[in-house]
From Swiss-Prot:
GO BP: any one term: cytoplasmic translational initiation
Listed GO CC annotations: cytosol; eukaryotic translation initiation factor 2 complex
Keywords: Cytoplasm, Initiation factor, Metal-binding, Protein biosynthesis, Zinc, Zinc-finger
PANTHER family: EUKARYOTIC TRANSLATION INITIATION FACTOR (PTHR23001), EUKARYOTIC TRANSLATION INITIATION FACTOR 2B FAMILY PROTEIN _ EIF-2B FAMILY PROTEIN (PTHR23001:SF45)
Major localization listed first in the record, in broad terms: cytoplasm
Any coiled-coil regions, as ranges: none
Region spans: Disordered: 1-38
Stated name of the protein: Eukaryotic translation initiation factor 2 subunit beta
Organism: Triticum aestivum (Wheat)
Length: 270
């Protein structure tokens, strides 16, 4: 009994020991949890989740549940791929509404990683213009005429070699064009055996170009749509220019001969 009493006293003494301020207080270890580890743990936990047909969630451990294969309709399989039949159905609906979406243009760079080229972007701009403003981006042709070929014949004559070719390009009668050229130059001339225009005087190719531009602006180009597809006709002593593109018509001024200097000798008494 005495031994037991001594042991109890020792325990009480240890429990009521005086406070020692020199001793350091033990610090608790702070465990820093990595958020990535937490995400991995959550992913491992959620892998076992599966949704039953009744809509209730059930935990099936860590094993993944196999996905059920979707059975295709035999009618779709006989017709071909499911996507093709769906596309056909959509096309029928669109045609019924009057709006066709399947005709959208596909550009070469779509579905690839390469950069687009300047010509491709230019084509895209014109496609957008044709869709939104068909009048502005119509099939307007640009007429390019060859420059006049001029040769010298002797010292006092000039030969217009490709005169007939330019008349065919403008769709005008050679007599009308020749009358305008001679009136503007203030000289005389005629066609030779090779259908070349021989003019009296010395003229440079620039002179012919300037006169032909004035003739085209006055007797060829339509002032409304700027189209060269016009017809020059004479009605009641007046010339009318009718456009085949826009249908407009206008009267043109008759060709007036300018001042022609008389160089030859005059007869006596006149």
């Amino acid at each position: 009994m005495a031994d037991e009493e001594q042991m109890e006293r020792k325990e009480e003494a240890t429990e009521i020991a005086p406070f020692d301020p020199t001793k350091k207080k033990k610090k608790k270890k702070v465990v820093i949890q990595d958020p990535a580890d937490e995400v991995d743990k959550l992913a491992e936990k959620t892998e076992g989740l599966s949704v039953t047909e009744s809509g209730e969630a059930s935990f099936v451990g860590l094993k993944k549940k196999k996905k059920k294969l979707v059975e295709l309709d035999p009618s779709l399989v006989e017709a071909g791929d499911g996507e093709d039949t769906l596309d056909d159905q959509v096309g029928e609906d669109e045609q019924g509404e009057g709006i066709v979406l399947g005709g959208a243009t596909q550009y070469p760079w779509e579905g690839t990683d390469r950069d687009y080229k300047y010509d491709e972007l230019l084509g895209r701009v014109f496609n957008i213009l044709r869709e939104n403003n068909p009048d502005l981006a119509g099939d307007r042709r640009r007429t390019v005429m060859r420059p006049p070929q001029v040769l010298r014949e002797g010292t006092k004559k000039t030969v217009f070699v490709n005169f007939m070719d330019l008349c065919k390009t403008m769709h005008r009668q050679p007599e009308h064009v020749m009358m305008f050229l001679l009136a503007e130059m203030g000289t005389s001339g005629s066609l030779d055996g090779q259908q070349r225009l021989v003019i009296k005087g010395r003229f440079a190719p620039k002179n012919f170009e300037a006169i032909l531009r004035r003739y085209i602006n006055e007797y060829v180009i339509c002032h409304g749509c700027k189209s060269p597809d016009t017809i020059l006709s004479k009605e009641n002593r007046l010339f009318f220019l009718r456009c085949e593109q826009c249908g407009s018509s206008r009267s043109v001024a008759p060709i007036k001969a300018g001042f022609v200097a008389q160089v030859g000798r005059r007869k006596a008494g006149t």
